[in-house]
């Protein structure tokens, strides 16, 4: 299973990405709560650095425009195929648009895109700000994972 969210690109590329520590803690908790075996999940970014826009220093300035990260749906979906992922979890509408998912997809929705089962969740930052949604999201993911683990 592949997980992605818009800020995964900055989280992988920038040691001091704003909010990185909170997102990392969120995913550690989520993976622990799901209790799936190691190697079941991987993370693949929905956006990549625009090499022409990357500064010499990897640390972003306060309030820096993050537009130096660009979506590349073709790279993402070819990575999903190369990883032989049985499903993709897309967190947030920005990531969903970046990956070319149909307009109007909503959190806690399942669809097929490019032949792959996709589950759309709320954005990580939204879940951090609205912790009462965590239980609903966790229940949805557990049910969804049962679909692919039976195959």
Give residue ranges: language-model regions.
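A polyanion-binding, active-site-adjacent surface
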Residues: 1-151
């Amino acid at each position: 299973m592949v997980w992605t969210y818009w800020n995964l690109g900055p989280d992988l590329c920038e040691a001091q990405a704003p909010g990185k520590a909170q997102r990392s803690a969120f995913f550690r908790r989520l993976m622990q709560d799901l209790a799936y075996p190691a190697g079941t999940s991987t993370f693949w970014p929905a956006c990549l650095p625009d090499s022409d826009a990357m500064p010499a220093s990897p640390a972003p300035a306060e309030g820096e425009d993050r537009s130096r990260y660009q979506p590349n749906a073709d790279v993402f979906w070819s990575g999903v195929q190369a990883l032989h992922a049985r499903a993709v979890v897309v967190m947030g509408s920005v990531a969903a648009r970046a990956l070319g998912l149909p307009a109007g997809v909503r959190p806690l929705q399942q669809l097929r895109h490019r032949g792959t089962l996709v589950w759309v969740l709320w954005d990580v930052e939204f879940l951090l700000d609205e912790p009462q949604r965590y239980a609903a999201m966790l229940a949805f993911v557990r049910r969804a994972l049962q679909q692919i683990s039976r195959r």
